[in-house]
């Protein structure tokens, strides 16, 4: 395992020239949580700011209007030094009311289950799931709320605009979503360096490796910019747990 100093040196070797960082926080947080760790925003900003050649660290995350915790987190991000790009989170009501459908119908379940998995479910499994939903309905629960706030368009637009206006050499993108294949290829074709920070990328991005796309495994930064989710304690400083998770509930 490399020391923090060695990791910093490694980052410097990857992020060459004038660099802009684009953090899709919802995407990063979801991936980190699956590995039982969380991003410490203090240490993230401090780490990349210390490299000397990072001129912008852009943080994309939705805000729940009127929610003190959400609005406070955004204020904190700005105070730390991030360039925060946000918009209101949309709360979508998804029906779980199975009262009007056959017990073996997947019409409600398919809203929450990927098609590839849905096709594998047996009739018995679907009936059991609908049975659980019916119990929820009987207790008065007819819908669930899902928060939605996607920044793919904003991030892609900012990357291309920064390329035109700010002569950026290296683009550090913290998301591995397929929607970025087009913008990334455009930057690569203009001889720019693009590095995706993620522990997994879409096949569309993986196909761009021969064109010059590089992928940095974000798990390697866990000890440098993270803290353990299950303990709620920073790997380096206890104060990090106050700001890292941003549970906007």
Report the location of each language-model feature:
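Nuclease catalytic cores that cleave nucleic-acid phosphodiester bonds
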Residues: 86, 91-249
């Amino acid at each position: 395992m490399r020391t923090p100093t060695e990791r910093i040196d490694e980052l410097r070797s990857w992020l060459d020239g004038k660099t802009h960082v684009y953090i899709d926080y919802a995407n990063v947080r979801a991936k980190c949580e699956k590995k039982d760790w969380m991003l410490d925003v203090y240490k993230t900003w401090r780490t990349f700011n210390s490299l000397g050649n990072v001129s912008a660290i852009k943080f994309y995350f939705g805000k729940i209007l009127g929610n003190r915790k959400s609005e406070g987190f955004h204020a904190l991000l700005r105070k730390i030094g991030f360039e925060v790009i946000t918009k209101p989170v949309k709360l979508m009501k998804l029906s779980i009311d199975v009262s009007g459908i056959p017990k073996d119908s997947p019409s409600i379940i398919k809203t929450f289950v990927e098609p590839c998995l849905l096709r594998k479910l047996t009739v018995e499994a679907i009936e059991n799931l609908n049975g659980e939903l019916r119990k929820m309905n009987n207790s008065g629960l007819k819908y669930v709320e899902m928060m939605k706030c996607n920044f793919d368009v904003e991030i892609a637009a900012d990357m291309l605009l920064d390329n035109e206006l700010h002569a950026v050499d290296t683009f550090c993108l913290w998301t591995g979503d397929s929607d970025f294949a087009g913008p990334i290829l455009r930057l690569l074709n203009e001889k720019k360096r693009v590095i995706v920070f993620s522990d997994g990328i879409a096949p569309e991005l993986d196909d761009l490796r021969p064109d010059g796309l590089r992928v940095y495994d974000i798990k390697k930064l866990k000890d440098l910019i993270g803290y353990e989710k299950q303990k709620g304690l920073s790997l380096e400083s206890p104060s990090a747990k106050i700001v890292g998770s941003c549970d906007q509930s």
